[in-house]
Amino acid sequence: MRSKIEAGDYVRPCDGERQSGDAAFVQFQDDGVLIALVDVLGHGKAAHVLAVSLTESLSKWLREVRSPSPDAALSVLHEAARGTRGAVASVAWINATTLEGNVTGIGNVRCRLFGSAAKTIKFDDGLLGFRARSRMPVSLALMPADVLLLFSDGVSERFDASQYPTLTLDPAPTIAFNIVQRFGKGRDDASCAVLRCKP
């Protein structure tokens, strides 16, 4: 599996803060990989603690299920966020053999695909822990060298491959770092989680 898919993430707190309210989650399973990006409302330590707690809820859930789905994972996050300040998130699952899967989300965590076909996926408004209307997962069929990005609203969505010519060539951790460093906004927590299908 790891020979076909690689993953990476990078999280940077906003200016003046030492901890971020964004958190990335990557978990390789026997047949694929689940990747998630969580953006808690607010900044600083309290937001960071909640973001970590939410990703830990995903980790615990994955120990109990055989076939995870992004929609079920988002429901886990929604329940874990009840009684808190709330968060937005996106979750994707990719099968390691077929490179097919799906992605879903709530709120303004973005999803973009680069490589064989450029695609931008936006999600309905909402807030985990408060209001989360039913979601229809978006199907994905990736190809070798395709790159799937999940990124928070602390990263500008107004960039394209011409501004990052080696986007589909770099290792996943390098891509995540470069997306945040090049296109991140200093006034907000910025984060990016990456799945890259190797050529």
Task: Cite the ranges covered by each PLM segment.
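Small-residue (GG/TT-enriched) beta-loop-alpha framework at ligand/catalytic clefts
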Residues: A118-F130, D170-A172, Q181-G184
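C-terminal catalytic subdomain
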Residues: L77-H78, P144, L149-P199
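Active-site metal-binding loops of divalent metal-dependent hydrolases
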Residues: D39-L41, V109, D153-G154
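Sensory/regulatory domains in signal-transduction proteins
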Residues: P13, G32, E100, A117-D124, ...
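N-terminal entry segment of metal-dependent catalytic domains or homologous docking segments
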Residues: M1-E56, R131-R133, P137-S139, D188
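Catalytic core of PPM/PP2C metal-dependent serine/threonine phosphatase domains
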Residues: S20, H48-A117, R135, R187, ...
